Amino acid sequence: MPNPAELAAHHWGFAAFLLGVVGLLAFMLGVSALLGSKAFGRSKNEPFESGIVPTGGARLRLSAKFYLVAMLFVIFDVEALFLFAWSVSVRESGWAGLIEATIFIAILLAGLVYLWRIGALDWAPESRRKRQAKLKQ
């Protein structure tokens, strides 16, 4: 086990980096506190609305569909990254890599078909979809 003097000699660069980060952080916070505006008033607590008088509350309830679409996007986006990594190394991976990528794509498509079949990708309720289908006829 190295003694403390050897550790200090070995990690002096990291310690200097941390000291620089803390110093820069203190400098930026100090300058912003000195130069920043200190105006307090009733209008300070109101949200900025581009010159439009705000109406109603600032809290807006979003449908759970937005969160579902966001999660599906993240999942399929990460899977697209895996496919991109495979496409970069397709020559090195050979036939085994092609078979694995084909299985991976098949699993992706099965997941997409499953989500489609259970209605996870439908934005409108079923009653509204039936009503719109009748209107199109």
Curated annotation (Swiss-Prot):
Report the EC number(s), separated by commas if there are several.
7.1.1.-
Q: What class of enzyme is it?
A: translocase
Where in the cell does this protein reside?
Cell inner membrane
Q: Which Gene3D superfamilies match?
A: NADH:ubiquinone/plastoquinone oxidoreductase, chain 3 (1.20.58.1610)
Question: Per its record, what are the GO molecular function terms?
Answer: NADH dehydrogenase (ubiquinone) activity; NADH:ubiquinone reductase (non-electrogenic) activity; quinone binding
Q: Where are the transmembrane segments?
A: 14-34, 66-86, 95-115
What GO cellular-component annotations does this UniProt entry give? NADH dehydrogenase complex; plasma membrane
Task: Give the superkingdom in one word.
Answer: Bacteria
Membrane topology (UniProt):
Multi-pass membrane protein
Q: What is its main location?
A: membrane
Record keywords: Cell membrane included? yes
What keywords does the record list, in alphabetical order? Cell inner membrane, Cell membrane, Membrane, NAD, Quinone, Translocase, Transmembrane, Transmembrane helix, Transport, Ubiquinone
InterPro entries in alphabetical order: NAD(P)H_OxRDtase_bac/plastid, NADH_UbQ/plastoQ_OxRdtase_su3, NDAH_ubi_oxred_su3_sf
The protein's annotated catalytic reaction(s) are: a quinone + NADH + 5 H(+)(in) = a quinol + NAD(+) + 4 H(+)(out)
Summary of subunit composition and partner proteins: NDH-1 is composed of 13 different subunits. Subunits NuoA, H, J, K, L, M, N constitute the membrane sector of the complex.
Q: Which family does it belong to?
A: Belongs to the complex I subunit 3 family.
Q: Outline what the protein does.
A: NDH-1 shuttles electrons from NADH, via FMN and iron-sulfur (Fe-S) centers, to quinones in the respiratory chain. The immediate electron acceptor for the enzyme in this species is believed to be ubiquinone. Couples the redox reaction to proton translocation (for every two electrons transferred, four hydrogen ions are translocated across the cytoplasmic membrane), and thus conserves the redox energy in a proton gradient.
The name on file for this protein is: NADH-quinone oxidoreductase subunit A 1
| Upper classification of the organism | Bacteria, Pseudomonadati, Pseudomonadota, Gammaproteobacteria, Pseudomonadales
